[in-house]
Amino acid sequence: MNVLVIGAGGREHALAYKLNQSNLVKQEFVIPGNEAMTPIAEVHTEISESNHQGILDFAKQQNVDWVVIGPEQPLIDGLADILRANGFKVFGPNKQAAQIEGSKLFAKKIMKKYNIPTADYKEVERKKDALTYIENCELPVVVKKDGLAAGKGVIIADTIEAARSAIEIMYGDEEEGTVVFETFLEGEEFSLMTFVNGDLAVPFDCIAQDHKRAFDHDEGPNTGGMGAYCPVPHISDDVLKLTNETIAQPIAKAMLNEGYQFFGVLYIGAILTKDGPKVIEFNARFGDPEAQVLLSRMESDLMQHIIDLDEGKRTEFKWKNESIVGVMLASKGYPDAYEKGHKVSGFDLNENYFVSGLKKQGDTFVTSGGRVILAIGKGDNVQDAQRDAYEKVSQIQSDHLFYRHDIANKALQLK
């Protein structure tokens, strides 16, 4: 069959890499993709992921059987709806169901209605109300801007001054807009991907742990993710089972009950508190960089899993008996302002590197984004995989990238 992947980042690079391994996939295309994907797929950087008509025309011309949508923005903009209306099979939720990521308030309200464990919250619609609320709220407080923010719309404020600063950042020059305040939850965070078709929810039996903060020791601002690893040895199978029973199954049923037909992967960003697992966030697609490490460890056929889900079958995932660690290299300055156009070399175009923000300039690759390239390490255990990942990092040549030195340290400290 002919498969089209939508997106240009490392997550889509990993999806294309994994789908390319399937005997079911005859031809693979990526829109817009990036030049690092050319060994595994036909890349069409001339079509943007926001050009829905261009994508539809291409899918018709190439007799595409399945479209796999990677990033959140096309989902929230309704690309899946347009493709389905024209007879294409799509892995990714429709516009209505994608609200579970597109609106933090939508997600909080549905969790509250169906008693799905999450932090207590308060929503405000005006800047002055936000400033009033923080005068007497419990600290630390989590401040979230409603809507998409590329993983950077969340600030944890430890003091009233920090909360005021967060409000200024969220509102800018505007006086109105939805901001959600949440009680700060303490515990161990983890990411659970769940394949969902209506009220059928099939969670991965392998979880990943992301590293959101920019710098070592979980310092600095939130980012889209600076690295990840799987499996997570200090999150037990019992916790995974409980997360499935109290979060994954109930949210699938709740969405369907509310009239939202979700088909695709639901990312559950969870935290293991003293009261059990609770939801931090939902995403309507694979995590990035979690997808890169999980799909590197997946032994079974991703395309077959997608078809099984479409047919309402409880698909069974199979995993390699190894640990995977992924370390993200980012442009200096990220997640704030950063320069583009700097040369990066020393890496091979293979399964050891997934590219997020590079483009070809002549014969060389130059930076084109904040997060640039993820180095993948593999080993019999987390320690060996971590060592291998940083060995891969050391091979990359550039004076304009930075990375965290402690990805997966938590697994080593808590084992």
From Swiss-Prot:
EC number(s) on file: 6.3.4.13
Stretches assigned to the ATP-grasp domain: 108-311
GO BP: 'de novo' IMP biosynthetic process; purine nucleobase biosynthetic process
Pathway(s) the chain acts in: Purine metabolism; IMP biosynthesis via de novo pathway; N(1)-(5-phospho-D-ribosyl)glycinamide from 5-phospho-alpha-D-ribose 1-diphosphate: step 2/2
A Pfam entry, by short name: GARS_A
Cofactor binding note of this UniProt entry: Binds 1 Mg(2+) or Mn(2+) ion per subunit.
SMART domains given in the database record: GARS_A, GARS_C
Record-linked HAMAP family: GARS
Protein name: Phosphoribosylamine--glycine ligase
Record organism: Staphylococcus aureus (strain Mu50 / ATCC 700699)
Lineage summary: Bacteria, Bacillati, Bacillota, Bacilli, Bacillales
